[in-house]
């Protein structure tokens, strides 16, 4: 498609409307390169992607993608065997992480049926080994200490040396305060110094590094810290060297995967671009138009995208219709209507939503040509008419039946009679060539051409004779008429002059009356359509109100049922507590054996009313929690014993997992790590008690995990667990309750305090869960 039409219709300004929605530099580059397409399947694919994104937002109400810098230049540098700096590696790390997040997001899209985006999601690849290694680069672009043992050693030594220097200088600040111009430790050339008064410079032995501009202060590095500062300088050099070595190693890790990473980055950027199109469509009440296969155009309530308060209009350009001629006076909005059609076509053929209502339809043109406004060439010293005619000649030479042609004020700039004749001849040529054309003109002769010629239709812009102002409403099928007499009368021209003028134009009076009648019919039709639309809007509002009331009612009902359930549970808990008290008294009196107490307690539990809530749909819906999923390669984890973050890289045959933690590979069982994502931690726990054999052979240990449980559910499981532990003669058990809000932990503590079979309990050691777990000794 020719680029001139993009400039004439200011298509770049339309593209700029999408910029605020973009988060990645890749999508910004894609927007910059966006141009109209001439192949219907490609346009359809773009529209399908927007429809898919709409389905995602309906299901999830969001589509999370982080800001990503362009990594194209960094990938080129890798291909040239150049090492990347820390910021470039951080940008690639974010792409790898975003790719992994997007793959997990796609796997959770259960109720979305895709037409196009599924292929993009499925082409994303994960790099668990790379992600694990890249944990050594934090989000601030800093290499963590654990990036290598050598780096950790250097930084630890550097910290110690700096602390010693600081301590020595702080002691000197106190001892030599009267010799100093300021009570602070300064830095010159990367070395710690003291600001000494020039008059006392000989009182402190050391190296002078700087003198203040006034000469009153000398910055001295005391001899006591010279050696330490030299060590620090050397350690910093060693640190830079080690960091360079690590960055080189990271660059080498990336090189074999450049093509795949580049593809991932493009997919993420394109998904961001599709997201931006959807948000633009949603915010501007735009639509995805249908694509006609017979050059039919139908734009319903179409608006100009660059105007702040555009008037919506309907435009129908049927297959058989070749030309629409908009007649009438200037300043009525004819040119705006012309540009609105052109921009709607450009946006649609570029795969963008069109500012129109559902049901709109675009055609696919190989080219769109326009002669709009005064494009007079000063260099060529051409008149307005010559400039227009030169452009029109060029259009007529290039346009074919797959083109759309837009003419503004066709035939203007010359003798009206000759200009009108030229305009009709040009339109006739285009009509016979089956080239769709929309033209504006103020020549009345073209009204007759539109009425008398097949496949040509008149149109006009509505004018309010009462306010003497245009309404900018497009009236298709109604030719424009002059409002000169009405305007002149309202502005105070003598009635006899207006009457005389009318008598001079009697030959046109019949035509004007017909036009007036057509206008009246069009206005009445529009009034009825507006009324129908108002009724439709009222119906929509009513439906929304009914849905809102229903949702509020359902919410209140669920709350009441939950409240009733909690009250019932409290009654049961009270009864069980009373039973514990009774059993305690019995045991104190009769010294019953533990298993006899458990049997008695079971009998008392049977006395509580067993209400079957499993079939209660409301409670099931309220309590439904997404089933736990197994870990998978690429998941981010926290190693429980160390608190370090890592990434799962592979699963061994025996069920254990290999994980990359910094630059260290670890082999872990599934209970030695937890998934990072909070929403994946809230899973329904298996009520089975796992007995773990201790390595020292001190006997069996049982562990109960209460994390993620409701309070009452946790207390019931704890009670049952202690009973079973007593029956199995277990001496010690572990209760994992987590830290969280502390409610479960407090409940566990209270229960253990009042249970006479608990000999001792305390929080676990720090390396075994700390205050998130309690070790219980039974007896």
From Swiss-Prot:
<dbReference type="InterPro" id="IPR036063">
    <property type="entry name" value="Smr_dom_sf"/>
</dbReference>
<keyword id="KW-0547">Nucleotide-binding</keyword>
<dbReference type="InterPro" id="IPR046893">
    <property type="entry name" value="MSSS"/>
</dbReference>
<feature type="domain" description="Smr">
    <location>
        <begin position="704"/>
        <end position="779"/>
    </location>
</feature>
<dbReference type="GO" id="GO:0043023">
    <property type="term" value="F:ribosomal large subunit binding"/>
</dbReference>
<keyword id="KW-0238">DNA-binding</keyword>
<dbReference type="GO" id="GO:0004519">
    <property type="term" value="F:endonuclease activity"/>
</dbReference>
<keyword id="KW-0255">Endonuclease</keyword>
<dbReference type="InterPro" id="IPR007696">
    <property type="entry name" value="DNA_mismatch_repair_MutS_core"/>
</dbReference>
<dbReference type="Pfam" id="PF01713">
    <property type="entry name" value="Smr"/>
</dbReference>
<dbReference type="GO" id="GO:0019843">
    <property type="term" value="F:rRNA binding"/>
</dbReference>
<dbReference type="GO" id="GO:0016887">
    <property type="term" value="F:ATP hydrolysis activity"/>
</dbReference>
<keyword id="KW-0378">Hydrolase</keyword>
<protein>
    <recommendedName>
        <fullName>Endonuclease MutS2</fullName>
        <ecNumber>3.1.-.-</ecNumber>
        <ecNumber>3.6.4.-</ecNumber>
    </recommendedName>
</protein>
<keyword id="KW-0694">RNA-binding</keyword>
<dbReference type="InterPro" id="IPR002625">
    <property type="entry name" value="Smr_dom"/>
</dbReference>
<comment type="function">
    <text>Acts as a ribosome collision sensor, splitting the ribosome into its 2 subunits. Detects stalled/collided 70S ribosomes which it binds and splits by an ATP-hydrolysis driven conformational change. Acts upstream of the ribosome quality control system (RQC), a ribosome-associated complex that mediates the extraction of incompletely synthesized nascent chains from stalled ribosomes and their subsequent degradation. Probably generates substrates for RQC.</text>
</comment>
<dbReference type="GO" id="GO:0005524">
    <property type="term" value="F:ATP binding"/>
</dbReference>
<dbReference type="InterPro" id="IPR027417">
    <property type="entry name" value="P-loop_NTPase"/>
</dbReference>
<dbReference type="GO" id="GO:0006298">
    <property type="term" value="P:mismatch repair"/>
</dbReference>
<comment type="function">
    <text>Endonuclease that is involved in the suppression of homologous recombination and thus may have a key role in the control of bacterial genetic diversity.</text>
</comment>
<dbReference type="GO" id="GO:0030983">
    <property type="term" value="F:mismatched DNA binding"/>
</dbReference>
<dbReference type="Pfam" id="PF20297">
    <property type="entry name" value="MSSS"/>
</dbReference>
<dbReference type="GO" id="GO:0045910">
    <property type="term" value="P:negative regulation of DNA recombination"/>
</dbReference>
<keyword id="KW-0699">rRNA-binding</keyword>
<dbReference type="GO" id="GO:0140664">
    <property type="term" value="F:ATP-dependent DNA damage sensor activity"/>
</dbReference>
<comment type="subunit">
    <text>Homodimer. Binds to stalled ribosomes, contacting rRNA.</text>
</comment>
<dbReference type="GO" id="GO:0072344">
    <property type="term" value="P:rescue of stalled ribosome"/>
</dbReference>
<dbReference type="InterPro" id="IPR045076">
    <property type="entry name" value="MutS"/>
</dbReference>
<dbReference type="Pfam" id="PF00488">
    <property type="entry name" value="MutS_V"/>
</dbReference>
<dbReference type="InterPro" id="IPR036187">
    <property type="entry name" value="DNA_mismatch_repair_MutS_sf"/>
</dbReference>
<dbReference type="InterPro" id="IPR005747">
    <property type="entry name" value="MutS2"/>
</dbReference>
<comment type="similarity">
    <text>Belongs to the DNA mismatch repair MutS family. MutS2 subfamily.</text>
</comment>
<dbReference type="InterPro" id="IPR000432">
    <property type="entry name" value="DNA_mismatch_repair_MutS_C"/>
</dbReference>
<keyword id="KW-0540">Nuclease</keyword>
<keyword id="KW-0067">ATP-binding</keyword>
<feature type="binding site">
    <location>
        <begin position="328"/>
        <end position="335"/>
    </location>
    <ligand>
        <name>ATP</name>
    </ligand>
</feature>
């Amino acid at each position: 498609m020719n680029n001139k039409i993009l400039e004439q219709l200011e298509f770049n300004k339309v593209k700029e409307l999408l910029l605020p929605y973009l988060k990645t530099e890749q999508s910004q580059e894609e927007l910059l390169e966006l141009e109209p397409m001439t192949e219907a399947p490609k346009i359809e694919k773009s529209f399908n992607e927007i429809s898919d994104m709409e389905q995602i937002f309906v299901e999830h109400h969001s589509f999370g993608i982080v800001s990503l810098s362009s990594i194209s230049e960094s990938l080129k540098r890798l291909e040239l065997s150049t090492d990347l700096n820390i910021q470039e590696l951080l940008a690639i790390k974010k792409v790898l992480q975003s790719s992994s997040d997007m793959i997990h997001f796609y796997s959770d899209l259960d109720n979305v049926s895709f037409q196009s985006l599924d292929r993009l999601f499925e082409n994303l690849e994960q790099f668990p080994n790379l992600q694990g290694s890249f944990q050594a680069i934090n989000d601030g672009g800093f290499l963590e200490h654990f990036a290598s043992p050598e780096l950790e050693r250097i930084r630890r030594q550097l910290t110690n040396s700096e602390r010693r220097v600081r301590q020595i200088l702080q002691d000197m600040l106190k001892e030599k305060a009267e010799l100093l111009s300021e009570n602070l430790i300064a830095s010159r050339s990367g070395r710690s110094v003291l600001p000494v008064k020039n008059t006392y410079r000989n009182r402190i032995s050391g190296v002078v590094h700087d003198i203040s501009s006034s000469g009153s202060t000398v910055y001295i590095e005391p001899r006591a810290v010279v050696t330490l500062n030299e060590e620090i300088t050397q350690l910093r050099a060693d640190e830079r060297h080690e960091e360079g070595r690590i960055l080189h190693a990271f660059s080498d890790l990336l090189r074999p995967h450049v093509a795949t990473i580049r593809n991932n980055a493009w997919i993420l950027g394109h998904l961001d671009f599709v997201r931006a199109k959807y948000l633009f469509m949603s915010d501007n009440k735009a639509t995805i138009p249908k694509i006609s296969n017979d050059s039919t155009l139908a734009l319903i309530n179409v608006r100009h995208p660059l105007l702040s308060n555009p008037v919506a209009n309907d435009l129908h350009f049927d297959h058989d219709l070749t030309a629409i001629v908009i007649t009438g006076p200037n300043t009525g909005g004819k040119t705006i209507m012309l540009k609105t059609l052109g921009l709607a076509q450009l946006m649609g053929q570029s795969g963008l939503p069109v500012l129109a209502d559902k049901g709109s339809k675009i055609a696919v043109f190989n080219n769109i040509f326009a002669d709009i406004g005064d494009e007079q060439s000063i260099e060529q010293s051409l008149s307005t008419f010559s400039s227009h005619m030169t452009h029109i000649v060029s259009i007529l030479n290039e346009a074919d039946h797959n083109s759309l042609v837009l003419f503004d004020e066709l035939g203007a700039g010359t003798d009206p009679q000759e200009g009108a004749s030229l305009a009709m001849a040009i339109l006739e040529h285009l009509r016979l060539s089956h080239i769709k054309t929309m033209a504006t003109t103020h020549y009345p002769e073209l009204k007759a051409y539109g009425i008398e010629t097949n496949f040509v239709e008149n149109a006009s812009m509505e004018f309010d004779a009462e306010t003497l102002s245009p309404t900018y409403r497009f009236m298709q099928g109604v030719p424009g008429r002059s409002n000169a007499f009405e305007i002149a009368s309202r502005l105070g021209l003598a009635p006899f002059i207006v009457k005389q003028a009318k008598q001079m134009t009697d030959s046109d009076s019949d035509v004007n009356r017909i036009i007036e009648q057509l206008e009246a019919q069009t206005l009445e039709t529009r009034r009825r359509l507006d009324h129908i639309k108002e009724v439709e809007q009222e119906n929509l509002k009513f439906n929304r109100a009914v849905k809102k009331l229903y949702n509020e009612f359902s919410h209140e009902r669920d709350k009441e049922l939950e409240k009733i359930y909690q009250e019932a549970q409290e009654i049961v808990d009270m009864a069980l507590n009373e039973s514990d008290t009774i059993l305690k008294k019995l045991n104190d009196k009769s010294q019953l054996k533990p298993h006899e107490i458990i049997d008695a307690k079971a009998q008392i539990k049977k006395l509580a009313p067993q209400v079957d809530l499993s079939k209660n749909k409301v409670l099931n819906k309220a309590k439904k929690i997404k089933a736990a999923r197994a870990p998978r390669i690429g998941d981010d984890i926290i190693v429980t014993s160390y608190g370090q973050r890592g990434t799962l890289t592979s699963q061994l045959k025996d069920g254990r997992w290999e994980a990359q933690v910094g630059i260290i590979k670890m082999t872990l069982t599934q209970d030695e790590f937890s998934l990072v994502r909070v929403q994946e931690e809230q899973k329904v726990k298996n009520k089975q008690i796992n007995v773990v054999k201790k390595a020292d052979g001190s006997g069996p240990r049982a562990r109960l995990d209460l994390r993620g449980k409701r309070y009452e559910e946790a207390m019931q499981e704890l009670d049952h667990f202690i009973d079973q532990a007593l029956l199995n003669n277990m001496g010690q058990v572990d209760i994992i309750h987590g830290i969280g809000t502390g409610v479960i932990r407090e409940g566990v503590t209270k229960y253990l305090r009042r249970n006479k079979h608990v000999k001792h309990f305390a929080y676990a050691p720090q390396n075994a869960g700390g205050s998130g777990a309690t070790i219980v000794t039974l007896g």
